[in-house]
Swiss-Prot record:
Protein name: Exodeoxyribonuclease 7 large subunit
Family classification: Belongs to the XseA family.
Chief place where the protein resides: cytoplasm
Record has Phosphoprotein as a keyword: no
Organism whose genome encodes this protein: Helicobacter acinonychis (strain Sheeba)
Oligomeric form and interacting partners: Heterooligomer composed of large and small subunits.
Length: 420
């Protein structure tokens, strides 16, 4: 058998292990945990009572963890075996990590959700409406938390006339559930009294899933569902969705977001009020103008009934009669003129007048011919068409004409006409 080099044997081990252990799930205790702040990668060992194996959790997978990885924690890791040939080391490259018994917790939560769903805890018809202008709001949180400070700041900016009352509550760890339940019951006890709260907001900032898991407890769900006061759940960040979010009347992604959702904006309402004021002024001006026009109409009506106005109306009627008389006179004269023109036309078409007219036209033509002869040059000729004198420029191609002077008379046809 040929000897293998160290590199060759490590390469073969790498190929064998990585092909064989593509997916492994290993449970153990976290030890030697190191989290690099710059890269975001985590390195640790997983151990039990007899053995240890190194693990890596790269930044992309580390950011997906639903809890904070801690030294000494019992976890189950899911990943693949990887080998580093230069040192002959092998390790688990982790894809997912869950706390020990996390699977059983998830199953229990799903069963609880189904139980509450059947009881109507998630039904929209059981949700209370959000108050439009809250005057007094109970904030269930830790009075020393950043969440409480942020909520106060945003509330003062948006709706400073609202009173926020912090009910100091334990928001994580042992005793958290009981503390939250008691605070909800206390705030709701003011319902329908002079000091009643318009809303109850259960709020805390982000954290690991272990820190937030208390808000998946059935006792908190019962307290929110039984409350007669409108309730909001504002736990963790946008990506954190807990049972309290589903049971409360309304969910907010963060404590600050709860104030933005619950409280109206004073600036927006100031703008709306300014708009209402302008509309009111316009409406008043329009109404005032309408009333003024109506009064002027009434005054005019009264004036028409006065004696002076009656006299004025009679004068107008007399003027109208004068105009009508003038129009009738003009119409009569037009009729007379038309009649005279008709008689004149009839006379002009009588046989006697027609004969005299024809005779007059013949004499006029003879006179024109004689006048033309007087102007003829020595070798010239008089041009006529149909016994009518005609100028050369009036002739057209094809016209039949007569030429005559003292010595002769001739007929001709026009072949062309050239005008100067």
């Amino acid at each position: 058998m040929d000897a293998l080099s160290v590199s060759e044997i490590n390469a073969k081990i790498k190929a064998l292990l990585e092909a064989t252990f593509l997916q492994v799930r290993v449970q153990g205790e976290v030890s030697n945990l190191t989290i690099h702040k710059v890269s975001g990668h985590a390195y640790f060992s997983l151990k039990d009572s007899q053995s240890v194996i190194r693990c890596t959790l790269f930044r992309g997978n580390a950011s997906k963890l639903k809890f904070a990885l801690k030294e000494g924690q019992e976890v189950a890791v899911f990943g693949a075996i990887s080998v580093y040939p230069p040192r002959g080391d092998y390790q688990i490259n982790c894809f997912e990590i869950e706390p020990k018994d996390w699977g059983s917790l998830a199953l229990a939560l799903e069963q609880l959700k189904e139980k509450l769903r059947l009881k109507g805890y998630f039904d929209k018809e059981n949700k209370l409406p959000k108050p439009s202008f809250p005057k007094r709001v109970a904030i269930i949180t830790s009075q020393n938390s950043a969440a409480w400070a942020d909520m106060q700041k945003i509330a003062f900016k948006r709706w400073p006339m609202c009173e926020l009352v912090c009910i100091n509550t334990l928001m994580q760890g042992e005793g958290c559930v009981q503390s939250v339940v008691e605070s909800i019951a206390y705030a709701d006890s003011f319902y329908n009294t002079r000091n009643a709260f318009d809303a109850i907001v259960v709020a805390r900032g982000g954290g690991s899933m272990e820190d937030l898991y208390s808000f998946n407890d059935e006792r908190i769900a019962d307290a929110l569902h039984l409350a007669k006061t409108f309730s909001m759940s504002a736990i963790g960040h946008e990506s954190d969705f807990l049972l309290s979010d589903s049971v409360a009347d309304l969910r907010a992604s963060t404590p600050s977001n709860a104030m933005e959702i619950l409280l109206p904006s004073s600036e927006e309402w100031q703008q709306k009020l300014d708009g209402f004021n302008l509309k009111l002024q316009r409406s008043f001006k329009i109404l005032l103008h309408q009333k003024k026009v109506h009064l002027e109409h009434l005054a005019a009506s009264l004036k028409r009934l006065s004696f002076e106005n009656k006299h004025h109306l009679n004068s107008l009627k007399l003027e109208k009669l004068k105009i009508a008389l003038e129009n009738k006179t003009l119409e009569f004269l037009r009729l007379k003129k038309t009649l005279l023109e008709k008689i004149s036309t009839q006379l002009s078409t009588s046989p006697f007048l027609q004969t005299k007219t024809e005779r007059l036209n013949a004499l006029d033509n003879a006179l024109k011919l004689a006048h033309a002869h007087l102007k003829l040059p020595k070798f010239g000729a008089f041009v006529s068409k149909n016994n009518q004198a005609i100028e050369l420029e009036e002739l057209k191609i094809g016209d039949k004409i007569e030429l005559n002077n003292e010595k002769a008379r001739a007929s001709a046809a026009i072949l062309s006409v050239d005008k100067a």
